[in-house]
């Protein structure tokens, strides 16, 4: 191992090397941890197949490390991974009068809720290698455009900070504590997901000490406090039991003048650690339509169509191409239903001497993707039959 370390010191780090030579001294490729590398700096990000069976796996959510030629040094410490309430790995369980955190019984007094703003998380950290503060997403070390709109997240952060809050890069450099990572949420029209905000904004969410992971309270800030308080602030809510929590979640589904289609809440322990996400049902529905690539979106539209759920989606979520696809889908399905109803009547008027005669007639007269309905004796509504098989036949619809 010593020989290997000596070899690394004499070569330029790259992602392949860092999968073996990293702060945890393990083969990250075997643990489904991705390494994003830039010069001697790496960002660690869990892969979709990560089992989260090691304590440090939760840290692999955008934490940034730098190798100075002798040892690894943390550059940033954003959130650790936490899950939606319904997911099996979530550490929080809600009971009527108490909560379980990592299996330990706690009071509702030990937690609080904050709105989960529907934007892009930005970690602001000091890069000692280049000597400046860097606002970055949790997923990359490299500057990239926001959905190909011609502006990067770094540019958007500095632009909104200066124009909306009067906070310049030089002012941050003079006042912010380099021992901390500052976490923000950018919510703007150019990076909009589901929630519609009345104005572009940056929320200051929290700050974390890089060395020990401590979440700072407002009383622990120094010169940077006035600037942090200038950004949009996250509201905290306290509840006494599960019933109050669910009522709050239900109330938060409603739109207001400042925010439409809110996402839900983050549940935090009183020490500031995020332990669960609870999302509104409406948001989950809308997110399924809006997120993902065009093929995924079409699949969601098809599912909603057969569930009679398209009317529940606000019209502003559909562009012209989506609306045209919905019309083609309706036309195709309605035409198919009419055709099959006519074929059912035709079948009833015929006499088939053998099962083979019937099978030959079905094969010759019924579209292959739905002939199973006839081979099953045309039992029940044809539309219900289609609905039950929408997943199996979904490719038939999405390319209309």
Predicted regions and their residues:
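Core nucleotide-handling region used for phosphoryl-transfer chemistry
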Residues: 4-400
